[in-house]
Amino acid sequence: MAIKEETNEFSQGNEGNSHSTNNNNNSNNSNSNNNADVSAPVDDDDDDDGTSQGKTQKERRKIEIKFIQEKSRRHITFSKRKAGIMKKAYELSVLTGTQVLLLVVSETGLVYTFTTPKLQPLVTKSEGKNLIQACLNAPEEGLGDDQENQSDGNTGDSPDQSPAPATNPNVMGAAGHAHHIQQQQQQQQQAQQQAQQQMAPMPSHGLPTHYSNPQGAGNPGVPPQQQGQHQPGIPLQGGYSDQYSYFGNIQNNNIPNQQQYQ
């Protein structure tokens, strides 16, 4: 009986020790959990897409930043992100004392704003509303650039549609002047041919009707030493001592600064 009682006492002592050990372990676990909660950093990210509040930071997955094709998921993401950015704007204005103006427009055209008091007239007055509406109604810049580039490429591929070069009035005037000069030259050549035909030998029994200079008188404008001398290219007529008197009334347009003597 004594052995049995000792055994019971020992077993009871062991049970007491086990209870105390369990209590110590529970207290240690609670302390470690409290320390972990104190040392763990506070998550300030409001990105809740694809995650739940019960999941830890390690279980979060990174989403690819691209346009969401599914309409329902796109609307859900818009609602969550809009609420998060509005919250961030409010916290920024309160924590730092800065003025914040946040403008968010949904896919359906609804406008959401967050403004601090000093910037609130920008979205409440008619001028600000009209400016926002004008910006929303403006065409897309990227689309306009693509259309312009496409139109430029079309004009480059179709040379038949290119405008004709503008005529320069100076060039036209110069061409007309050159044509006029050419006509004058032709007239001068015709006059010279007629003069050569009139230079045929005449009979020596009389003087021409246009003769005005007496024989022996020199031609004014010709040096005295050259008067009465034969010049090459001018035929001398029989019965005339002064070759210049015969050609006195014949006007040659090819000779510059010529004068006609009578």
From Swiss-Prot:
Taxonomy, superkingdom: Eukaryota
Its biological purpose: Transcription factor that is recruited by AHR1 to the promoters of genes involved in biofilm formation, which include several key adhesion genes. Plays an important role in cell adhesion, hyphal growth and virulence. Implicated in the regulation of opaque-phase-specific gene expression.
Factors inducing expression: Expression is high in white-phase cells and low in opaque-phase cells.
Source organism phylogeny: Eukaryota, Fungi, Dikarya, Ascomycota, Saccharomycotina
A GO term from the CC aspect: chromatin
Subcellular location: Nucleus
Domain MADS-box: start-end pairs: 58-118
Name of protein: Transcription factor of morphogenesis MCM1
UniProt GO MF annotations: DNA binding; DNA-binding transcription factor activity, RNA polymerase II-specific; protein dimerization activity; RNA polymerase II cis-regulatory region sequence-specific DNA binding
Subunit structure: Interacts with AHR1.
Compositionally biased residues, Low complexity: 17-35, 182-198, 224-239, 249-262
InterPro entries: MADS-box/MEF2_TF, SRF-like_MADS-box, TF_MADSbox, TF_MADSbox_sf
Gene name for this UniProt entry: MCM1
Primary location recorded for the protein, binned into one broad class: nucleus
Entry keyword set: Cell adhesion, DNA-binding, Nucleus, Transcription, Transcription regulation, Virulence
Residue segments, region Disordered: 1-62, 140-262
Stretches with biased composition (Polar residues): 150-170
Biological processes, Gene Ontology terms: cell adhesion; DNA damage response; filamentous growth; filamentous growth of a population of unicellular organisms; positive regulation of pseudohyphal growth by positive regulation of transcription from RNA polymerase II promoter; positive regulation of transcription by RNA polymerase II; regulation of pseudohyphal growth
